[in-house]
Every structure is written in C-alpha cells, then in structure tokens.
From Swiss-Prot:
It comes from Methylobacillus flagellatus (strain ATCC 51484 / DSM 6875 / VKM B-1610 / KT). InterPro entries: KH_dom-like_a/b, RbfA, RbfA_dom_sf, Ribosome-bd_factorA_CS. One of several proteins that assist in the late maturation steps of the functional core of the 30S ribosomal subunit. Associates with free 30S ribosomal subunits (but not with 30S subunits that are part of 70S ribosomes or polysomes). Required for efficient processing of 16S rRNA. May interact with the 5'-terminal helix region of 16S rRNA. Monomer. Binds 30S ribosomal subunits, but not 50S ribosomal subunits or 70S ribosomes. PROSITE patterns: RBFA. Signal peptide: none annotated. GO terms for cellular component: cytosol. This is Ribosome-binding factor A. HAMAP family: RbfA. Coiled coil: none annotated. Keywords: Cytoplasm, Ribosome biogenesis. Belongs to the RbfA family. It is found in: Cytoplasm. One of its GO terms (molecular function) is ribosomal small subunit binding.
Length: 125
C-alpha cells in the first residue's frame, strides 16, 4: 500500500533540505555557526507558519537570537527556491532530544557493570 503524504509534510521536508543548505553556505551571521543541524520542520495546515527544530553543539541563547535575526533572510531565500505562493514565517525551536538521548545513554552506561572482554579472560599458564 502506498503511503500518502500531505502537502504540508512535503513542503516541510523541502524547507528542511533548503534551510540546511542555506544555514551551511549562505548565512554570514557569526552567531549562527555552520554546525547547526535542522532536525525537523513542522508546517501549519494553512502553511503560514513553520516551526524549525534545530540542534547545535553549543545551543546558546546567542545562537537562538542569531537564527531569529536571520529568519527574514532565510525566508526570502526560500521564496526564491520554492514554488510557493506564500512562504511560511519561520519560528526556531531548540531540539533538546539529542542532549536528552546522550544523557540517558550515559546514565545507562554508568548503571550497567562493565562487560569483560572474552579474550582477556584466559590467563597464561
């Protein structure tokens, strides 16, 4: 059975690809590093707003301010690249799921006893 995607889902995927490219190569704001990763984009049903979830090695308030400042530039560049009547307003949201996942993995590693290497168990006689 073919899985169908709504138009807003397809637009969100295209915006995610284009924003990743724009953030890496076009944005010159020093607060916005090229290490920003767009993890997901959610577009409203009327396509007037888009939540852009991102992650970065240093997710700081300065980065958030830099992204908000470049939102107009990014929107204008999206208008040139996408065939849409209106380009959604961009709202940037820090995606903390990767940080939470790393913290949980660390807690699991600390809770489990270390696994002995089977090659080191055999003692020479």
């Amino acid at each position: 059975m073919v899985k169908e995607f709504s138009r807003s889902d397809r637009v969100a995927e295209q915006i995610q690809r284009e924003l990743a490219d724009l953030l890496q190569f076009e944005v010159k704001d020093p607060r916005v590093s090229s290490m920003v990763t767009v993890t997901e984009v959610e577009v409203s049903g009327d396509m007037s707003h888009a939540k852009v979830y991102y992650t970065a090695p240093q997710g700081t308030p300065e980065l958030q301010k830099g992204l908000e400042k470049t939102a107009g530039f990014l929107r204008s560049q999206l208008a040139r690249r996408l065939l849409l009547r209106t380009v959604p307003q961009l709202h940037f949201v820090y995606d903390a799921s990767i940080d939470r996942g790393m913290r949980i993995a660390k807690l699991i590693d600390e809770a489990l006893p270390p696994v002995a290497d089977p090659d080191q168990d055999s003692e020479p006689n």
